[in-house]
Amino acid sequence: MEFILVTPQAQPGVALIQLNRPKELNALNLQLMQEIRDALKALDEDDAVRVVVITGNERAFAAGADIKQMAGKTAIDMLITDQFSTWDQIRKFRKPLIGAVSGFALGGGCELAMTCDMLVASETAQFGQPEIRIGTMPGAGGTQRLTRAVGKAKAMEMVLTGEFISAWEAHRVGLVNRVVPVGQYLEEAYRLAATIAAMSPVAARLAKESVNRAFETHLDEGLHFERKNFYLTFASEDQKEGMAAFVEKRKPAFKGR
């Protein structure tokens, strides 16, 4: 049984990955995570795909890890399974990745949402890292990405209390880009994806790399990395096309080269 649905051309240049364990509120078991990893790898290599949207359903983006699968495991079991290698590979996805969130995004679901470059949330969305309530803590980026997104004070509060925050609170603290009425989250994510898909894929990939580097290094090294990627855009056909189109007052036709 497959736990995700993949539509490579849901919109021109935009692929959709939909989590598909509705009875379990899209709880993230090992198979589902491996399917996401494999789908992203295939989409990363597909030149027709420029942006990927990942979503769940109205009730839940993903309500956390599959606790039934994890409950009996020991520390040694978790080390041997090495489930986090899958998360590391998802993190390395090079194209823009947009999360479309409705309902619960909790625990591993919140961590999966935070691997996205941008998030669109329904008004019904709730975000949280409630692992402490069951005697554990975030292990797939919840302490690191959340702190980078919302700051130490809010991250510490969410991680130590296990309390959820609403879509509007997530927007206020910088976790979410856009909040939309119920039922419009996927449409808005497609709209955002279409805007990005119309840009140069070369520039988008290099720009994504550069923004992410800002959280991984000191300023001087980050500026050096940014400058290197800026120079690389001038080795692309897209840069020539983009500037020619600007001068000629027409829309550019980017090819991703």
Regions found by a protein language model. Give the residues of each.
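Terminal peptide-recognition signature
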Residues: 17, 21, 36, 54, ...
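Conserved CoA-thioester-binding segment of acyl-CoA-metabolizing enzymes
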Residues: 1-57
